[in-house]
């Protein structure tokens, strides 16, 4: 594991080969860092230290429909042995959907400052949605569902929101229908191929990438 919060930004995604434009985090002791570990760390921070990383991992898994016995802080869905399993495929789909949502949100904005604010807003709403599932208020978080996507991006005040919702729904539905890791990467690459060059390689303030280990 690693001491302190693990943070990574920039570089290239090892699954898609595309530039990584957003910042990743993971709680102390994690051996992987990806969009899901970022949500786990954001969930811990949002709960002011009253929730452990393990509890946050279980909450994120439950909200996204993943097996709660899979520890997101050590499970690498891109590992050769894991990538061919049902859990590996499900975890990578969820990670890719989170990354795609946040990257498309950033791309709707004209400036880096606006992109940072938009990503932060959507991340906060996503964490609140995960907490609603943990509290029993709602049943699940579906990032390929237009009404849920619309609710998540409600705080984004500039850019073409209707197109953002449609593009995210289309991309994440394709990711959700993928039958293997390669298909997930292909769907994500198609969705993100036209990302603004001004955003590429710039660190923002929320989850992205789709499954790199802490040592990559």
Regions inferred by a protein language model and the residue ranges of each:
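Feature for extracytoplasmic/surface-facing segments of secreted or surface-associated proteins
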Residues: 1-216
